[in-house]
């Protein structure tokens, strides 16, 4: 994007944008018609806060969108973040992280593990026996793109989203 915005040309992007695009790095020629990366995650932080959650473990991939997800959640959640776990983008085995989560004994986890990451994370979270003990809050982890593969492993897990195909909206 930088070459375009530096050329003083308008750029309209349908993709989510890093939160910095709406703050210090805002460019008057860039228009993002989608959401900001931290928006959906803020809603989940607010939900956790209003639901009485006290202790949370955050699990996100270690790249800009993951960092925005964690920051968005923390912006609205004032409870105790007992651990923030940043995993490599594309990670598929979560045995070490699940051991850390179980040891931290949180009320909830907040996960942003999109795509195949989320499919595996949800299945392994359930297989580890954590789904019956720890509230699972997620964004882009349990959604229309991952549910066909997650199936019953995702039952009872909460997902925040800006849209879903099965919403009963006129």
What is each model feature region?
Residues 124-170:
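Extracellular/periplasmic periplasmic-binding protein-like sensory domains
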Residues 1-13, 23-25, 109, 125-134, ...:
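Extracytoplasmic "Venus flytrap"/periplasmic binding protein-like
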Residues 15-16, 60, 113, 140, ...:
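Short secondary-structure boundary segments
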Residues 7-8, 26, 77-78, 150-153:
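Short, structured coil segments at secondary-structure junctions
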Residues 8-19, 34, 135-141:
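Short beta-strand elements of ligand-binding domains
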Residues 3, 22-23, 98, 148-149:
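Short glycine-biased active-site loop of nucleotidyltransferases that positions the nucleotide triphosphate
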Residues 19-22, 28-128, 167-170:
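Extracellular/periplasmic Venus flytrap/periplasmic-binding protein
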């Amino acid at each position: 994007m930088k070459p375009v915005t530096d050329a003083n040309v308008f750029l309209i992007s349908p993709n989510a944008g890093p939160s910095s695009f709406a703050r210090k790095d805002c460019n008057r020629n860039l228009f993002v018609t989608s959401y900001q990366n931290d928006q959906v995650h803020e809603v989940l932080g607010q939900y956790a806060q209003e639901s009485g959650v006290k202790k949370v473990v955050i699990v996100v991939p270690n790249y800009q969108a993951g960092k925005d997800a964690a920051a968005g959640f923390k912006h609205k959640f004032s409870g105790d973040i007992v651990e923030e776990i940043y995993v490599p983008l594309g990670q598929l085995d979560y045995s070490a992280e699940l051991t850390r989560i179980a040891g931290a004994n949180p009320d909830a986890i907040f996960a942003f593990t999109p795509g195949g990451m989320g499919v595996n994370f949800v299945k392994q979270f359930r297989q580890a026996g954590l789904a019956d003990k720890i509230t699972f809050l997620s964004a882009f982890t349990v959604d229309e793109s991952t549910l066909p593969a997650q199936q019953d492993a995702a039952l009872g897990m909460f997902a925040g989203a800006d849209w879903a195909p099965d919403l009963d909206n006129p």
